[in-house]
Structure formats: C-alpha cells, structure tokens
Amino acid sequence: MKVIISGGGTGGHIFPAISIANAIKCKYKDAEILFVGAKGKMEMQKVPQAGYEIIGLPVAGFQRKRLWKNFSFPFKLLSSMQKAKKIIKTFSPDIVIGVGGYASGPILRSAVSQKIPTLIQEQNSYPGVTNKILADGVNRICVAYENMERWFPTNKIVFTGNPIRQNISLLESNMAEIKTMALKTFSLTLDKPIVLVVGGSLGA
C-alpha cells in the first residue's frame, strides 16, 4: 500500500499526521508513506526526524490581512499544482490523506482530479479554510467532534477522534506512577483542583 499524507504549517497538523503514518505502518508493515508539505515550514524538519520522507511544495497561504503580500500567491499555487500532479504520477498512491494547512490543498486537488481515494482529517471543532474548500471533493472526512455537519457533507463524515502519538498511548500502563511523579515534580496535591491550560497555534 502506498500512502501520501499532506499538510502542516503548525504542530497541530504535523504531529497528528505523523501519528497516522505510525498507525498505518503498525498495521501494514510494508506500507510506503510519502509526506508532502510546504517548503520552509515546520514539517520539513519534524517529518524527517520521525523517519519519513517529505517533499516540499512552494505553496504559501493567502494573507487575508496583508493583501499586498499576495502578489506571488497565484504563481506559487500554480507551481505547487504542477508539482503535486507530478508527485501523484510518480509515486502512484493508493490513497491521499490531508491533515489541514494550505500545503494539503494542491496534492488533494490533484488526487481528486485523478480519481484517487482521498480523505481529510480535521482535528478541530472549527475547521480550517483548506479543509472546508476540499470537503466537497474528497471521499471521506474524519472528525474529532460532533456536529461537524455544519461544515462538511453529512454523508462523508466519519467520527474517529484525534490521532495521538504512540508514546502517549503507552502511558496508560504506567499511569499511577506517572501521576505520582507529576504531583511531586510540580509540587501539587490532590486535595486541591488542578487546572491545565494549553494554548497557541504551533503544537501547544
């Protein structure tokens, strides 16, 4: 089985993508997986560090607040579409998976036009622009939250939850020990409520 996984820009897209790749490799040992991302973005470092090959496209996001910065946008998009078509032809995937971020647009569009099975994985309760644009063309849309029919065609939605890293799933067997260690590390006690706050758009 040959799989292309595309998307990125932030850790919120990249790490679920790597988790998907790892899950595929666990189930299909001989699966060939190719990542496609955006040149100069985080995925160009994180994906090879995880042991996977990645090809970068010159694609860039549309600047909605700084319109004057969009002069090169159509040229980069056209170049990315041409390169995406070449990648699809050369790699010949059985399925193409998009995880969000503008890098996934060209490769998913190309796969749809060539009748290759496609799906997108939406990690958020409010989908990104690229996934909303791609929704009508892809075969399936994997979501982590209910009521996503507000944004996507109901007949394409599959509730899967969010992919998690293998090292996180392995924590379950040592949860009691880890909990004790965490309480000690952060000087916390169980007689008071504990609130964890995370935020940011770069994988926090």
PLM ranges: what are they?
Residues 13-25:
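Short amphipathic alpha-helix
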Residues 83-96, 104-119, 132-140:
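Glycosyltransferases and closely related glycan-assembly transferases
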Residues 28, 86-92, 188-190:
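Glycine-rich phosphate-binding loop signature in dinucleotide/nucleotide-binding domains
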Residues 53, 112-180, 188:
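Active-site-proximal region of nucleotide-activated glycan assembly enzymes
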Residues 3-10, 26, 30-76, 81:
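Conserved nucleotide-sugar phosphate-binding/catalytic loop shared by glycosyltransferases and other
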Residues 8, 38-40, 59, 123, ...:
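Cofactor-binding loop segments of dinucleotide-utilizing enzymes, especially the Rossmann-like FAD-
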Residues 1, 47, 173-197:
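Nucleotide-sugar donor-binding and catalytic loop/hinge architecture
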Residues 72-86, 177, 181-183:
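Glycine-rich, highly charged phosphate/nucleotide-binding loops
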